[in-house]
A protein has these predicted regions:
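Flexible glycine-/small-residue-rich
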Residues: 11, 22-24, 88-90
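Short, surface-exposed charged micro-motifs
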Residues: 6-10, 78
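Rossmann-like S-adenosyl-L-methionine
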Residues: 29-178
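C-terminal lobe
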Residues: 17-28
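Nucleotide donor/acceptor-binding cores
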Residues: 16-18, 117-118
Length: 178
């Protein structure tokens, strides 16, 4: 049983930013490993903006644990899509194929055209991609997601895009259905 369990690389083709996550068991990296790995010039040349250790000591098929340590740089990378800026952390959900995401978001925007003036629910919101897209179109949206780091990403993205017509609630859809 070694230290490294997996590697997660999240990259934005629109901004060139890359966030790297090393999923590990509990333990320490070999002496000198982190100092060699985190030399600014090498990471910046590759577009890496953050290097994160995610600790998962559970003997399951769950990929990520709940504890993150920033080893170098930032804990989020930036994705740009359709004039919006998204702040994304290692474990929060965002569509992987940005061109298809834009098509999907535009389709959802068309479907919700008749709901202008009503409040829409983005259930299982992830990092808020759909909610933010609809808010940019003038819709009032509430995003609901169980994973708190994703909600933090969504709130930061809403704030940086100047969107006040969306809010993000942590919890399950069932907890907030009324």
């Amino acid at each position: 049983r070694g230290l490294l369990r997996g590697l997660i690389i999240r990259h934005s083709s629109s901004t060139g930013e890359t966030l790297v996550g090393m999923v590990t068991n509990k333990g320490r990296f070999p002496r000198g490993f982190l100092s060699d790995l985190t030399q600014d010039k090498n990471l910046k040349r590759l577009g890496i903006v953050g290097l994160i250790q995610n600790i998962n000591s559970q003997n399951t098929n769950v990929i990520m644990g709940s504890e993150n340590k920033v080893l170098w740089g930032k804990n989020r990378y930036i994705e740009s899509l359709g004039g919006l800026t998204f702040h994304l952390s290692l474990g929060s959900f965002f569509q992987v194929h940005s061109k298809q995401a834009e098509k999907l978001y535009n389709l959802i925007s068309q479907w919700t055209e008749e709901a202008k003036g009503q409040t829409l629910i983005d259930a299982y919101s992830g990092s808020g991609g759909i909610a933010l897209w609809l808010a940019k179109q003038g819709r009032n949206v509430i995003g609901i997601e169980k994973f708190e780091p994703a909600m933090e990403d969504a709130r930061q993205s809403a704030n940086s895009n100047g969107l006040s017509n969306c809010q993000f609630i942590t919890g399950t859809v069932e907890e907030h259905a009324a």
